[in-house]
Amino acid sequence: MRKNIRTGISRALAALAVFSIAGLAASQGSAADLASQSCDAKSGSNPAFCHGVRGDRAEGWMAQGRSEVMARNGMVTTSQPLAAEAGLEILRKGGNAVDAAVATAAVLNLVEPMNVGMAGDMFAIVYTAKDHKLHVLNASGVAASGQTLAFMNAHGYKVDPKNDGPGSGMPYAGILTDTVPGAAWGWQEVLDKYGTMKFKQVLEPAASYAEKGFAISERIAFDWHLPKAVNANRSQLENCCTEMDPDSVATWYIDGKQPKAGQIFKNPDLAKTFRILQAKGRDGFYKGPVAQALVNKVHALGGTMTMEDLASYKGEWAEPVMTDYHGYTLAELPPPSQGFAANEMLNILSACTDKVYPGQTLASLGPVDPRYWHLLIEAKALAYADLNRVNGDPNFNPGLADKVKSLTSMAHAQELCAKISPDKAMVTGTGNASGDGDTIVLSAADRWGNMVSWVNSNYANFGSGITVPGYGFILHNRGSLFTLDPNSPNVIAPHKRPYNTLAAAFVLQGGRTDGQLMALQLMGGDMQSQGHAQVMVNMVDLGANLQAASDMARFHHNQVRGTVDLESEAFKLVGAQLIAMGHKVRPTDGGNMGGYQAILMTPDPKEPKPSGAKNSTQPINGTYRAGTDHRKDGIAVGW
């Protein structure tokens, strides 16, 4: 009898479900296309759900979008799920954090092509558990041998008197902004030195996706638009640029149109290049047919890069810039990276908060108080003024390391406190490193305790906008951050690295390597260092966990315009008061707030330390915890 009752109920529910669905379809005329339902802030005809309100969490801080992800055998976090899963697959197959990082970056080369490519720049901080050391790799590009100041001046490009910082006088896109690719060299370099696998294994996920295709997500579709990169007269260099590169349109658009969310995208030419790297290593990129095709494209557009420029390229290993902040040591990339501005910004906050507002701390003020935001904005403005004044290629600027050491000292920070008024914004106006940089960042960690903090970029959206035909990769535009001021440490010169907005960080608890360890990044042009400082404050001063630190509202300050973009909920709280202080504040969404990724290792003294044996299945002696940015398609995965 009970069986008959259950059967009857099941049939009734099934009938009700069919009736309800049919009734819904009938009441609305025809069923909606569920695959097309999305919101557009600029559209006046959004679906009704776009006017809904967000649901609440069950616990913790109600504004936190998700919990931290936790695992013990390994973890990868980045801005795109397929890329993160590719890195995790490498970890499961026995690879280490470095192997996983390269695999993840390579997939991002395909799925976020506007942000990253093998012909762009790459930096990494590698923590090796066996010796408890940090290793910094700079694989950023250098100017071609013909890229002289005289060459730029001869084609009509002169220093901009309204901008005495990075990018002054340089075009923003086109062939004159390209520098010799560094990323492909860096991928192999870090594998050879600290990885356990070769290109054959770690590039396989990227090559396969490029051949078979992947579905473009909403967030990535929003960013997927090519810049104007050439003139109608292809060899004309003056006044660039008036139209898109046809090779880029053929490679990155679908039937000549910008891809839409849900469309399947393939890049067989890029797959071919991945296969060449698998077979020949980086020599397959910097020498031979790939290099020749790159040089041919550059010369067809009037550029100067040569086969020798490519064949002779080398990155370099360097030492991080390290400072202490309230019990934690922050390691940042050295010049030409902007990383050290985060060190200086935190020093200023540490030295000046009590002097500007006696008896107060950042925690006692908190993000509901306009004085909290005022302090952060002023600290950023002071740090970036120093950054833009001195930053450049250390190989062309003897003594730069000593200058950075001085600027990141507490003594210097204390000298700057007098420049911060408690109720009036300072006027800025030096430098204009774009806040619109398009970059990928990722963190990776393995069961042996190795960790990687990684940043890889084309600089602007689709870099220079120029694609190498037949090989499917974009050329970056980092050279647009050179200056044409002959007196600047950042003036353009052959074989020189430009000022670089890329930043990756690593955090040590009290400077020790036996305490908590964190790989930290926040991409997005000049948002990177100011973003690092903001999330450090969120965690160290305000007590946020890794996920909450990302989900909290951020600001972006533009140094030359003096404008402050503040995310909308924070603007509602403090916007009017900041404007009254003289800040040029405007509300904004998360589009130019960068994208954060972080992994924290928290040791457990009850657990045995991990084995150094390659075939070990023992997890780390603690827990990996990860946070990822909801402003991107961020995901953290572990096992």
Which sequence ranges carry the predicted segments?
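Active-site rim segments in enzyme catalytic domains, especially the processed small/beta chain
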Residues: L110-M114, D121-N138, N153, V159-D160, ...
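Extended C-terminal subregions enriched in glycine
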Residues: Y384, W448, K496, H532, ...
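Noncatalytic scaffold domains of N-terminal-nucleophile
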Residues: D33-E85, E89, A97-V98, V102-K280, ...
